[in-house]
Amino acid sequence: DEINRATPKTQSALLEAMQEHTVTVGNDSHKLEEPFFVLATQNPIENEGTYPLPEAQLDRFMFKILVEFPSKEELKGIVMLTEGANAPVIEKKMDGEGLLAARALVNQIPIADAVMDYLLDIVMETHVDNTYIKEGASPRAAQALIRGAKAKAFLDGRFNVSSKSYLF
């Protein structure tokens, strides 16, 4: 929670975990069990007591989702769901093995050359001279875009990547 409040030393340790799937304590390295992935929040409002996230760390996140403040009706729904006797009980829907199996299925979803080229063109366009883009998308970003399109196809019950897979 609020990853930008982590000290640079903690961020460095998290970067090691994200890149190498290991953590080091003293001189001992420990392999992290699969599936391992990081979900993080960032407080976009308050900057006091925060540390900037290094580009190398930001590049390892597949997506950044900006969550807007909910409407009054949405806020009411949130409050009604989370406060009082009707608060939902969180149920386990899948274990680690199931998640790894789903990941393997997603990886097998084919992507046509034309679709691949279109998605790579999007990434390449971030590298043209543009005053609005500070740094272009990395090769990891291209991989994440392809992986995200495959995952969307999988979640939609489709067995190939189409324009419906990347028009989020």
Name these PLM-found stretches.
Residues 2-6, 21:
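Conserved Walker B
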Residues 1-2, 13:
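Walker B catalytic acidic pair
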Residues 3, 29-30, 165:
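Proline- and acidic/polar-enriched loop/turn elements at helix boundaries
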